[in-house]
């Protein structure tokens, strides 16, 4: 894939409508696929433009992604996307600079209510590098939220490949929630997400 420029350039390939590009917010359900070959390498990336037929032919494993809206205004669209696609897992993104928001809680509760396993991806760690307390505070908020009645999950911060393997093995229990800390600008942590997807 390609890294972001820090101003949202990478997400332009995900948006369906011009108003999404202007606002920077997903308002619809976008569907994309990612292919892995037999060696675990990603088949389709931004350097090679491939259509879905070519991706499927070249892949030994296909992952379907449904990008859903995160904004409160489009919650009904998100609920429809989650309940109709019946995903194997849901990735909930949290901006390290924003922390837990009302919608983060809503999305976690939706996954719990629909019995969908989920992971948390804390993004934008590049802009909080010099403020370790911000990331620590976000991590603390996540742990508190996941311990709430009705959720009762354990957050597990992914630090290395062994952590990825451990969380992948225990993912079907729904009790351990993997947390990936990533930067879409520097690429830090992205390899752990790719490894998790390919297991």
PLM features: residue spans?
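P-loop NTPase switch module centered on the Walker A-proximal segment
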Residues: 1-73, 85
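Conserved, well-folded catalytic cores of nucleic-acid-processing
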Residues: 2, 37, 81-85, 110, ...
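Eukaryotic intrinsically disordered and solvent-exposed regulatory patches
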Residues: 18-20, 51, 77, 164-168, ...
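Single, functionally critical "micro-switch" positions that shape active/binding sites
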Residues: 23, 122, 182
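Short beta-strand segments at enzyme active-site cores
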Residues: 30, 119-122, 155
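Beta-strand elements of modular eukaryotic interaction domains
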Residues: 53-55, 81, 109-110, 170
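Conserved Switch II/interswitch segment of TRAFAC-class P-loop GTPases
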Residues: 60-64, 68-76, 84-108, 112-136
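Canonical P-loop GTPase G-domain recognition
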Residues: 127-199
């Amino acid at each position: 894939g390609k890294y972001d420029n820090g101003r949202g350039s990478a997400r332009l390939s995900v948006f369906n409508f011009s108003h999404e590009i202007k606002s920077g917010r997903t308002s619809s359900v976008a569907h994309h696929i990612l292919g892995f070959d037999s060696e675990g390498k990603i088949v389709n990336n931004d350097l090679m433009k491939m259509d879905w037929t070519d991706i499927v032919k070249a892949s030994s494993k296909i992952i379907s992604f449904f990008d859903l809206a995160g904004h409160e205004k489009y919650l009904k669209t998100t609920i429809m996307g989650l309940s109709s696609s019946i995903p194997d897992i849901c990735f909930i993104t949290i901006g390290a600079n924003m922390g837990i928001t009302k919608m983060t809680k809503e999305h976690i509760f939706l996954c719990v209510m629909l019995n969908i396993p989920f992971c948390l991806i804390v993004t934008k760690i590049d802009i909080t590098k010099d403020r370790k307390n911000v990331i620590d505070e976000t991590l603390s908020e996540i742990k508190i939220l996941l311990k709430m009645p009705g959720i009762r999950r354990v957050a597990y911060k992914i630090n290395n490949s062994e952590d990825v393997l451990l969380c992948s093995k225990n993912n079907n229990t729904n009790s351990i929630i993997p947390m990936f800390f990533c930067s879409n600008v520097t690429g830090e942590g992205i390899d752990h997400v790719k490894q998790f997807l390919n297991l």
